[in-house]
Amino acid sequence: MPMTEVLVVGAGPVGLALAADLRARGVDVALVERRTEVGAGTRAIGIHSPALALLEASGATDGILERAVRIARGEARADGRLLAAIRFDRLRARHPYVAALPQSDTIEVLTALAPPVRRGVTVESLRQEADGVRVGVAGADDLRAKVVVVASGWAGRSLVYRDGAVRTHHYPDRYVMADVTAPGGPVARVHLEREGVVESFPLPGGRRRLVAWAGREEVPDAAAFLHQAVARRTGVEIDTTGASSFGVRRAVAPALRRGRVIVVGDAAHEVSPIGGQGMNLGLLDALTLAPLLTPWARGGDGDGVDRWERDRLASARHAARLAFLNTLLGRASGPRAHAARSAALRTALRGPGGALFTQAYAMRLDRAASGT
């Protein structure tokens, strides 16, 4: 049975980015995906500067930037007034902005650079052997690889972790979301209002991603709720169709490595999407792992992978804490608490803390950001 150097399980943005990077390094890499078709929609939309820099190795950055809106400025607002501006264009980085584009576009760019995806392949088991990993596949012959990377989202955790090993905290908060045609230009805006947050991020083609806090109960009519919430909280009337509601949860795995099996992305950690760091966290997992896998898959001892694991776990915990802070700030509040929150944010963001805040939200504090 032939043995692949690296097998990547999962062809979402994280798995594709890893496979494309490894392919550019000349690694024999295979990519399998249980879904028979590419998922539609614009789930994660923002790619931060550290990930953009690391995507250069595979050639993906140029293709992404050709399709993206570059967000150089963000605004925190409350009660119709500007609390503070967030200046990504002042970052000391190769890419001092956030690249915003539909996730489907990101996947198209990465797919063109990655090896062909073998779709309809459901991985059922991973068994360590002396010189690699045997991969059990539903209804097909086993596969073998020197190293296996699980990048298949939360559904892939059972391949690596026992039940209960990855503790998951479900937040009570509900949100509604839609991509709409709306004014606003290439500026990201976060409206921190008494009734809850509204996030408004630019997308190509004059569209925007809108996300609104919706309390703690299921929303029966997401489109109607979002229309009313945006009008009340921001004063902007929009036409919302195709809105959806979602909840948030937090999980960080205790380890990212089991012998020759590595776990990256949502399979290893989930953070609230409020703040837009989840996909980037996975991309940074993959893109910092790639240069370590190349020698390991060719007979090396995996030197550096343990350090990589420690760094990525630390970054995941940091991102989870920041996402929790975003969730707290986005909840509804009474008049006094709202006034106090607005005053505190205005003071913090316009003072020395503003630069640190910008670094944190641009993921410049992630351990993978050094040198990017």
Segment roles from a protein language model:
Residues 13-20, 24, 246-325:
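Conserved mid-domain beta->alpha element of the FAD-binding
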Residues 147-248:
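Conserved FAD-binding catalytic core of PHBH/FMO-like flavoproteins
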Residues 23-43:
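Glycine-rich FAD pyrophosphate-binding loop
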Residues 3, 231, 292-372:
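C-terminal helical "tail/cap" subdomain of flavin- and related membrane-associated enzymes
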Residues 119-133:
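A conserved short coil-to-beta-strand element within the FAD-binding core of flavoproteins
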Residues 138-147:
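Core beta-strand elements of the Rossmann-like FAD/NAD(P) dinucleotide-binding domain
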Residues 43, 47-109:
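Active-site-adjacent segment of FAD-dependent monooxygenases/related oxidoreductases
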Residues 2-14:
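Beta1/beta-strand and adjacent pyrophosphate-binding region of the FAD-binding site
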